[in-house]
UniProtKB/Swiss-Prot annotation:
Biological source species: Anthoceros angustus (Hornwort)
Any one GO molecular function term: NADH dehydrogenase (ubiquinone) activity
Main location, first listed in the record: plastid
Protein name: NAD(P)H-quinone oxidoreductase subunit J, chloroplastic
Alphabetized HAMAP family for the sequence: NDH1_NuoC
Gene3D superfamilies: NADH:ubiquinone oxidoreductase, 30kDa subunit
Length: 169
């Protein structure tokens, strides 16, 4: 199964991708962004083991985590930007990890226990697009009221006709 996900001859393989292949960690190289940051696709079921391996490799800083809706009725994508912070590093190594999940059952293992900075970022992603981060210690709405129905940043979200406004406190 590893070979079918990692060995695509049309993809450009970077240094981190080669390291993951060497350690038999399934992923798909997606190339490089405009700044030369390697982008990799990882399956949801492989994400936690790869996250731990990346932390052990030296990616000790979760710079950002975000989510986007790929297309109405299509997949949702969770994106992690990791940085290898070291002393005396002028240009720290970076990587971008993308995880695509079905909107019908969007579940991704939480990396809160690897990078504590994932706490509010995963909660915001849950609140806005409904991705459930499994084993997150406080996965609940952070921006919207608890009574809010639906996921407001999904492209197929239907805006309700009536909003009940509450006083700010």
């Amino acid at each position: 199964m590893l070979e079918t996900f990692t060995n695509d001859t049309n993809e450009i393989q970077g240094r981190l991708s080669a390291w993951l292949i060497k350690h038999r960690l399934a992923h798909r190289p997606l190339g490089f962004d405009y700044q030369g940051v390697e982008t990799l696709q990882v399956r949801s079921e492989d994400w936690l083991s790869i996250a731990v391996a990346l932390y052990a490799y030296g990616f000790n800083y979760l710079r950002s985590q975000c989510v986007y809706d790929v297309a109405p009725g299509g997949l949702l994508a969770s994106v992690y930007h990791l940085t290898k912070v070291q002393s005396n590093a002028d240009q720290p190594e970076e990587v971008c990890i993308k995880i695509f999940v079905s909107r019908k059952n969007p579940k991704i293992p939480s990396v809160f226990w690897v990078w504590k900075g994932a706490d509010f970022q995963e909660r915001e992603s849950y609140d806005m697009l409904g991705i459930s981060y499994e084993s997150h210690p406080r996965l609940k709405r952070i921006l919207m009221p608890d009574s809010w129905i639906g996921w407001p940043l999904r492209k197929d979200y239907i805006v309700p006709n009536f909003y009940e406004l509450q006083d700010a406190y």
